[in-house]
């Protein structure tokens, strides 16, 4: 989909950019719903998969749903970052991601050393995923203040771009 943004970006066609990014959000929301459904189904089998684990099921479920939530953030919230990539500004994503990741690992290592608490480790993982998404989306709003995307726009544009997934 980022490929489809090159021409509208070059032509400064904001309407088309909004349409394509909204369409991307629509597709990603649908994929996210499938991933969510699959994750819920897989979670039903956790007792069979981890039946002989030394970890409590509370920790296992908390970790599973936290990582699932972190993954779903990309599908439901971060889809607009494709515009940064297509606009040759992927360095913004890299800077924010690497900075957040370094800080997260330092905090997790400190927590692991002093407290050895799995729940806190996992909560930090999820918290930084949410924080990263929030900061990245604020930056996208700053760089592209005109970018007002909605899933409704994306759904309505799916018929106007029938071949967008093939490119």
PLM regions with names:
Residues 5, 15-30, 161:
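Interfacial transmembrane-helix starts/ends
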Residues 37, 41-44, 48, 54-77, ...:
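Alpha-helical transmembrane segments of multi-pass membrane proteins
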Residues 7, 25-28, 74-104, 163:
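Substrate-agnostic recognition of the 12-TM MFS/MFS-like secondary transporter fold
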Residues 58, 91, 102-133:
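Membrane-interface helix-loop junctions in multi-pass transport and translocation proteins
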Residues 1-11, 25, 86, 144-148:
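Helix-loop junctions and terminal segments of transmembrane helices
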Residues 25-52, 106, 110-114, 134:
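Alpha-helical transmembrane segments of multi-pass membrane transport and lipid-handling proteins
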Residues 119, 134-167:
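Interhelical loop/hinge segments that connect adjacent transmembrane helices in multipass membrane
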Residues 1-7, 36-39, 70, 104-105, ...:
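Signature of the first transmembrane helix
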């Amino acid at each position: 989909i980022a490929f489809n943004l090159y021409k509208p970006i070059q032509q400064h066609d904001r309407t088309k950019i909004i349409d394509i990014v909204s369409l991307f959000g629509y597709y990603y929301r649908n994929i996210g719903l499938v991933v969510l459904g699959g994750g819920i189904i897989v979670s039903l089998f956790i007792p069979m998969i981890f039946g002989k684990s030394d970890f409590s099921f509370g920790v296992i479920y908390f970790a599973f749903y936290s990582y699932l939530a972190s993954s779903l953030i990309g599908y439901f919230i971060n889809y607009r970052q494709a515009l940064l990539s297509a606009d040759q500004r992927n360095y913004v994503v890299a800077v924010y991601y690497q900075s957040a990741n370094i800080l997260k690992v330092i905090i997790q290592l400190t927590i692991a050393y002093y407290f050895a608490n799995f729940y806190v480790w996992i909560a930090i993982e999820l918290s930084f995923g949410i924080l990263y998404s929030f900061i990245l989306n604020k930056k996208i709003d700053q760089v592209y203040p005109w970018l007002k995307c909605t899933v409704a726009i994306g759904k309505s544009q799916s018929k106007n771009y029938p071949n967008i997934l093939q490119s």
